Amino acid sequence: MAHFNECAHLIEGVDKAQNEYWDILGDEKDPLQVMLDMQRFLQIRLANVREYCYHPDKLETAGDVVSWMREQKDCIDDEFRELLTSLGEMSRGEKEASAVWKKWKARYIEAQEKRIDEMSPEDQLEIKFELVDIFHFVLNMFVGLGMNAEEIFKLYYLKNKHILNVKIMDIKQKFYRTYIVKVRTPKGVFWYAGKHESFIVNPYNDKYPGSGKILWNIYRKYGFNYKIRWSKCHGSREKSYEVERELISALKRKHPDTCINISPGGQGGEGRKWTEQQRLEHKLRLNNPETKTRMKNSQRIAQNRAERKARQSEVMKKFYSNGGNKKISEGTSRAQRKAPHWHEPLKSEIHELWVSLGKPATGPVVKALKGKYDVTSSALKNLIYLFRKEDV
């Protein structure tokens, strides 16, 4: 039986565990696979130290696997008894706690009727730790068969789909979450907090980068160099708004100079609204001759910076180094100079294709012609316009 204090002290590393979990999701890794790898490593290390322990990668025969599985089942049975005892409040001591399942104990009825939510946080945590101890040996069973997280999910999904005849993706539930974005720029690190609603179970599969106006200006200028941390689901829109306000308030206290939230949160942000007086003052500043001269000079300097020219040159070299890009670019320019330039029977062929696609814009037509005719949307623009005009 694990003693109460031995498990309780583990909570001291909860921040590290939380950060590790966020990092795993942020790196698009599977937490279950990480746990399987950890458990496999632990068993390999144990086998290397104690030769009488099984090595999970050396289970070759059915007999080896039977022995391995039986060991895990024995360990699970032992941990299950500890789990039951922990439900009697381990802070009372193991002997008193066992009254929850020992009917001959005087405290049996009292222990049986005790509500879980009335137990101390430490006792509730102890129960969860005991369940995790069982999970160690369940993981070992998967490791012994060489199964990974993807295979476990697929087989679990197929098994339940067959039994219940339901599809997980058909269950439409909206999730109300809050998040914190940490975005890195050449000017430093900035923070943003917000709220998001989606039907996606795992928010890290959402690819949602936040919605703040300043945040998106940063993305447009410096790219999507950010990390996002999601909260659990709050259950309702109202609760998520409440938590959003608390998050923004906390960020502004902790990072007063680098928190880029404009609004305090709660109902979404429309940005900072100017008064009529502020609008007038801004208009006067923009029309000031000195301001115009300063802006013009700044623009000229920016356009002539060596770094900017080098970057533009690199982009164009990369574009024209690809023969296909060069061909398309030259073809587009020629089409724009000489349009309309389509002749029969090609014109009729494209018209039939355009009609069969439901008379769309240029994009779908370009995709349909790919491989047969290398054209761009710009080259087709005038032709599609002509088709629409003739249909009227």
Swiss-Prot record:
Keyword terms of this UniProt record: DNA replication
SMART domains in UniProt: GIYc
Keyword Lipid metabolism: no
Key word Repeat present: no
Region listing for Disordered, in residue ranges: 322-341
GO BP, sorted A to Z: DNA replication
InterPro entries assigned to the protein according to its UniProt record, in alphabetical order: GIY-YIG_endonuc
CDD domains listed in its UniProt record: GIY-YIG_SegABCDEFG
Top-level taxonomic group: Viruses
Task performed by this protein: May play a role in viral DNA replication. Found associated with a viral DNA origin of replication and with host membranes, may attach this origin to the bacterial envelope to initiate replication.
Name of the featured protein: DNA replication protein
Upper classification of the organism: Viruses, Duplodnaviria, Heunggongvirae, Uroviricota, Caudoviricetes
